[in-house]
A protein has these predicted regions:
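Terminal targeting signals and extreme-terminal segments of soluble enzymes
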Residues: 1-291
Length: 291
C-alpha cells in the first residue's frame, strides 16, 4: 500500500501521449468535482516537461473554467509560446471529455544575480508545527471521533496540515474574527529530489486552504457549510527554491469579499522566515439555501 505522498507523486507523473500532449489521472473521489489544486499541479508538470529543466518556474496564472469530473482522465495540451535567452513561456489547456476545464500560463526564468535582495518579514510570530495538533486531531477532540467520511479523507491526505490558531466551531466564536488564517504544511512523506515535483506538489497544496481566509468571518471552517465555493483563478510567484516535504508556513488573508466573490492572498515561508512563494486567488461563494 503506497502512502499518500507516494500517491501524490504518482498523480503528478503524467503520461506523454504525443508531442506536447500529456494525460493525467483523475482519481475516483466522493467529491462532486476534481480538486483544483490537482489540475493546477498536473498542468504545471505538463508545462515543465516541455522545457530544458534548467529554468525553474517563477510565475503562473490560471483560470478554472469548468468543474472536472472525478475518475475521468484529463488531457493537457501544451503550447510553446516562447523560448528566449532568459525566459521560457508555456500555455497549457486542460481538456476533459472534449471540453476545456482549465488553462494556465507559466513562465520559467534562468536564475540571475541582480546585486540586491529584500523581503518583508512574516506578519507575526507563530508556534512551531510540532507544538500544534493536526486538523484530524482537532476534529477528533471536538467531536469525540472523526466521522467515517473525514477519517477516509484524513488517511488519503498527502499533506499534514496544522492550523496556527485553534479551529472555531460556533458562530459566536467567529463573530469578531478577522479574515486571516495561517497553517503549517508539509507532505506526509518524501517526494524525491526532482525540483519540478516539489513545485507542483506545493501548487497542489496552495489551493487547499487559501479560501479559508474568506470564510473565517462567515462560518466555522469545519462542520455544515452554508456556502458552496469554487476557485475561479489562481496566480503564484515562486521566489526561492524549496522542498514541499519540509514544513512551510502558509499565511493567508482576505482583503475583500463582495458580489459573491472573495479574494485571498497567501505568503508561504520556510521555518527561518524566508519568503518562498506568493499566491493570489479569487473564489466564488453561493449560498446553499438558495437565498
Amino acid at each position: 500500500m503506497t502512502n499518500p505522498a507516494e500517491r501524490l507523486v504518482d498523480l503528478l507523473d503524467l503520461e506523454r501521449i504525443e508531442v506536447d500532449i500529456f494525460r493525467g489521472r483523475s482519481p475516483e473521489e466522493s467529491l462532486q468535482r476534481v480538486f483544483g489544486g490537482q489540475v493546477a499541479g498536473q498542468a504545471l508538470v505538463a508545462a515543465g516537461r516541455t522545457t530544458d529543466g534548467e529554468r525553474p518556474v517563477h510565475s503562473l496564472h490560471a483560470y478554472f473554467l469548468r468543474p472536472g469530473r472525478p475518475g475521468v482522465p484529463i488531457v493537457y495540451q501544451v503550447e510553446r509560446v516562447r523560448d528566449g535567452r532568459s525566459f521560457t513561456t508555456r500555455r497549457v489547456t486542460a481538456v476533459q471529455e472534449g471540453r476545456t476545464i482549465f488553462n494556465l500560463t507559466a513562465s520559467f526564468h534562468r536564475p540571475e544575480e541582480a546585486g540586491f535582495e529584500h523581503q518583508l518579514p512574516p506578519a507575526r510570530t507563530v508556534p512551531d508545527p510540532e507544538e500544534l495538533p493536526t486538523v484530524a486531531d482537532e476534529v477528533r477532540e471536538h467531536l469525540g471521533a472523526l466521522p467515517e467520511a473525514l477519517e477516509r479523507m484524513a488517511r488519503r491526505q498527502p499533506f499534514d496540515i496544522r492550523y496556527v490558531d485553534r479551529l472555531r466551531w460556533t458562530h459566536e466564536e467567529i463573530k469578531d474574527a478577522d479574515p486571516r488564517s495561517a497553517v503549517w504544511m508539509r507532505a506526509v512523506g518524501p517526494l524525491g529530489d526532482d525540483p519540478l515535483v516539489h513545485t507542483c506538489a506545493l501548487t497542489y497544496a496552495s489551493d487547499m486552504t487559501l479560501l479559508d481566509a474568506v470564510r473565517i468571518p462567515v462560518e466555522p471552517l469545519w462542520g455544515p457549510r452554508g456556502f458552496d465555493m469554487a476557485s475561479l483563478d489562481h496566480a503564484m510567484w515562486f521566489h526561492r527554491p524549496f522542498r514541499a516535504d519540509e514544513w512551510f508556513l502558509y499565511d493567508q488573508e482576505s482583503p475583500i469579499a463582495t458580489g459573491g466573490r472573495g479574494l485571498a492572498r497567501g505568503r508561504i515561508y520556510d521555518r527561518s522566515g524566508q519568503l518562498l512563494v506568493s499566491v493570489v486567488q479569487e473564489g466564488l461563494f453561493r449560498r446553499l439555501d438558495g437565498r
